[in-house]
């Protein structure tokens, strides 16, 4: 059985793997095991972790399928332990893109206890960035942010949705999900970026009406830098009750860009390019 696949296109090299590695958190880190470029050979993601990890297959033993020299998928069929059909594709596109799509169909209602909404989340565990913050637009200006501690001020909602359209988290006894703590600031547009050395890692999203960002300063574990931790730059789509249906196939898309940082205007240009090339929905 093949557990991982190395793909190289243009300037970018990626290793996509299943959950077979027994890492710091056990066998759960499926997704992009390694991400480098010809100009930056240091892995963007934590070496015992991964990036673009879909929560719907995390720790659920997905199967790796190689589709071509530049595309592979992580696939899992619904069963009694998790009744969701899932296919996560990772396609490298020259010179510096990973186009990622998650297709899934719930065979039973898998919404959390007390939740009217369906959460579909991803984690990206970053490798020792000097600046742990993600950057996004707030009120037309760039805003840099990382939560002060794990589980505090972790969730960022979109500015283009009214309060009444946002999910209401249920009251729970004991510890609740770490990303259920929202900050006042809201993002204007469905993208963010972070810096890794002289490179920018950008995440550009489709289906913006369901999108949320969330983050942690320590989700990626210990850093190579003394007394520092590695952040998690995460995101999710929240499907409201009015749009949720058992048996319906959903497709959620994100473009990852990994290239030398040029300017914030270049980030905007990459988003506009994704909209034009991939037909992403805009706000």
List the predicted regions and their residue ranges.
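Beta-strand-rich recognition/accessory modules
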Residues: 3-7, 167-283
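Extracellular structured ligand-interaction cores
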Residues: 59-61, 85-89, 95-101, 117-123, ...
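Low-complexity, serine/threonine/proline-enriched polar segments
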Residues: 137-186
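Short, surface-exposed beta-strand/loop "edge" segments at domain boundaries and coil↔beta transitions
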Residues: 22-25, 35-45, 79-86, 110-113, ...
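Acidic-aromatic substrate-binding/catalytic surfaces of carbohydrate-active enzymes
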Residues: 1-69
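Primarily extracytoplasmic ectodomains and periplasmic/lumenal surface modules that are beta-strand-rich
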Residues: 12-14, 20-26, 96-98, 107-112, ...
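Extended, loop-rich substrate-binding clefts of extracytoplasmic carbohydrate-active enzymes
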Residues: 47-98, 104-109, 113-116
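Acidic (Asp/Glu-rich), glycine- and aromatic
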Residues: 97-154, 264
């Amino acid at each position: 059985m093949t557990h991982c696949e190395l793909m190289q296109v243009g300037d970018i090299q990626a290793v996509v793997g299943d959950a077979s590695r027994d890492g710091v958190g056990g066998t759960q880190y499926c997704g992009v095991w390694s991400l480098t470029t010809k100009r930056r050979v240091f892995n963007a993601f934590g070496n015992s972790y991964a990036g673009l990890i879909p929560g719907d297959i995390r720790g659920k033993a997905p199967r790796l399928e190689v589709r071509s020299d530049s595309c592979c998928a992580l696939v899992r069929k619904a069963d009694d332990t998790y009744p969701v059909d899932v296919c996560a594709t990772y396609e490298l596109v020259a010179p510096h893109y990973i186009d990622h799509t998650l297709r899934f169909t719930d065979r039973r209602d898998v919404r959390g206890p007390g939740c009217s909404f369906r959460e579909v989340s991803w984690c990206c565990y970053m490798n020792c960035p000097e600046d742990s913050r993600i950057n996004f637009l707030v009120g037309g200006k760039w805003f840099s942010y990382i939560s002060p501690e794990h589980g505090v001020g972790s969730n960022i909602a979109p500015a283009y949705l009214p309060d009444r359209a946002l999910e209401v988290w249920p009251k729970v006894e004991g510890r609740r999900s770490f990303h259920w703590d929202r900050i006042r600031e809201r993002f204007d547009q469905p993208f963010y970026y972070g810096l890794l050395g002289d490179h920018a890692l950008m995440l550009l999203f489709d289906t913006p009406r369901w999108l949320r960002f969330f983050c942690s300063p320590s989700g990626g574990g210990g850093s190579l830098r003394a007394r520092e931790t590695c952040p998690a730059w995460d995101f999710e789509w929240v499907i409201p009750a009015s749009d949720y249906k058992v048996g319906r196939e959903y497709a959620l898309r994100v473009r990852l860009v990994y290239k030398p940082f040029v300017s914030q205007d270049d980030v905007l240009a990459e988003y506009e390019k994704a909209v034009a090339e991939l037909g992403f929905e805009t706000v």
